[in-house]
Regions:
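Short alpha-helix capping/helix-loop boundary micro-motifs
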Residues: 92-97
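HotDog/MaoC-like acyl-thioester-processing domains
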Residues: 1-13, 100-152
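Hot-dog-fold acyl-thioester-processing enzymes
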Residues: 1-89
């Protein structure tokens, strides 16, 4: 984990890759829980038997939004910010789902800092580049720019 002591250190890291998270398994249970939470019960995500018969992967695949929803976990496991009281998610840019994520596969996030600027109320708005890698695949599962505002 890379720990930044203050906002100035974050700003100095603009344009750099900070690191990659550990691999995280995307289990069928996680997919089912996400489907339940979001109401997205499309069979390609939750019907294991039908997926075995009809999908090229022969298994269910994770929701693209589940893949994206792992971004905060990836960032927190790679970057530490001292003296932070809280963080609010501000938005996302340029989200692309490039490779399906089969149930049981592993993902990790490769994190870079694309931009950092002062925000109101002693905040720092940071745009993170997140490349979600799928273990065993040359293409990433997802690429996105996630924006967060950190407050001290």
């Amino acid at each position: 984990m890379h720990v930044f002591e203050n906002f100035e250190e974050v700003k100095a890291a603009i344009g750099t890759e900070v690191g990659a998270s550990e691999w995280l398994e995307v289990t069928q249970k996680r997919i089912d829980q996400f489907a339940e939470a979001t109401g997205d019960q499309q069979w390609i995500h939750v019907d294991v038997e039908r997926a075995r018969r009809e999908l090229p992967t022969h298994t269910t695949i994770a929701h693209g939004l589940l893949t994206l929803a792992l971004a905060p976990w990836f960032v927190r496991s790679v970057i530490g910010l001292k003296a932070i009281k809280n963080t609010l998610k501000y938005g996302a840019n340029r989200i692309r789902y490039l490779t399906p994520v089969p149930a049981g596969s592993k993902l990790r996030g490769r994190i870079s800092i694309l931009a950092a600027e002062d925000a109101p109320q002693d905040g720092l708005r940071v745009t993170y580049g997140i490349t979600t890698e799928l273990q065993g695949s040359e293409r990433p599962a997802c690429v996105a720019e996630m924006i967060a505002v950190h407050y001290c």
